[in-house]
Design a protein with these regions (language model features):
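Transmembrane helix-bundle signature of multi-pass membrane transporters/permeases
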Residues: 1-2, 47-50, 54, 95-101, ...
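The feature identifies polytopic integral membrane transport proteins across all domains of life
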Residues: 73-75, 88-92, 120-129, 150-156, ...
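Structural signal for the N-terminal portions of transmembrane helices
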Residues: 46, 151-164, 188-215
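Conserved small/polar residues in nucleotide/adenosyl-binding loops
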Residues: 217-220
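Membrane-interfacial helical/loop segments at transmembrane boundaries in membrane proteins
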Residues: 67-82, 179-198
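Cytoplasmic-side transmembrane-helix entry/capping segments in multi-pass membrane proteins
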Residues: 18-22, 40-48
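Helix-loop-helix hairpins and the membrane-proximal interhelical loops
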Residues: 46-94
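Membrane-interfacial helix-loop connectors
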Residues: 1-20, 98-135, 144-146, 182-193
Length: 220
């Protein structure tokens, strides 16, 4: 999901990401059928990236256009100016949407598109991202129901990890998100608002996971 956010942010919404897929496939195919395991591993890695680019292009092409549906856009914007309640509401929306789609990369792409088009602001986009981090754990937990004890423990750890992260980020919501915003604006030097908001969400997702990992790793 983090890689998806950074790729879309770096390449933009107007670049045909799928155009990168064919050269990658041409490069990966001979390696994929190589007799050497090291070359085959490289081929599989590049092959996966090629399909990732194709999937990202499909997500971008099929994302809902709220601008063409003013009634839906007005409905969404009715719930964007209720203070911290809007943050909590969009967090639940992000979680439920990801549970339904069962692909956090897809909901991340939708979030980036909504923020880049100005349909929701950066802070509400962050709330959706937090919800997506919780919603994405449902797939793992459902799959673990038929697995062994280790699989169920791993799925539960994934859920606890993300819920713990969401809880402390909500406590420090504005300081944390504003710090990420400052980093993108002043360190990465991204000034275009439509582009900057995508980088801010990608940077937030990265900072969230790194910070959460460090907190849990250093806790007794």
């Amino acid at each position: 999901t983090t890689v998806t956010a950074w790729l879309i942010s770096a390449l933009g919404f107007k670049v045909d990401i799928a155009a990168f897929a064919l050269p990658l496939l041409a490069f990966a195919l001979p390696l994929f059928f190589s007799g050497k395991s090291s070359r085959k591993s490289i081929g599989e890695f590049v092959f996966g990236f090629a399909f990732l680019f194709m999937g990202l292009q499909s997500l971008k092409a099929n994302a809902p256009d709220l601008g063409a549906n003013p009634e839906m856009l007005a409905f969404v914007q009715n719930y964007t100016d209720m203070g911290f309640f809007s943050i909590i509401l969009f967090l639940f929306i992000g979680a439920i949407l990801t549970m339904i789609v069962q692909a956090s990369a897809a909901t991340m792409a939708i979030t980036l598109i909504m923020c880049a088009n100005g349909w929701i602001d950066y802070h509400l986009g962050v709330a959706l991202v937090l919800g997506e981090n919780i919603g994405t754990t449902v797939t793992a937990n459902l799959a673990a129901l038929t697995g062994n004890t280790q699989a169920r423990r791993a799925a539960l750890a994934h859920l606890v990890f993300n819920i713990f992260g969401v809880m402390w980020v909500l406590v420090l919501f504005y300081p944390f998100t504003n710090a990420v915003s400052w980093f993108v604006t002043h360190v990465m030097k991204v000034s275009d608002p439509a582009v900057a908001v995508s980088f801010k969400l990608a940077a937030f997702h990265t900072a969230f996971n790194i910070s959460n990992t460090c907190l849990l790793y250093t806790s007794p």
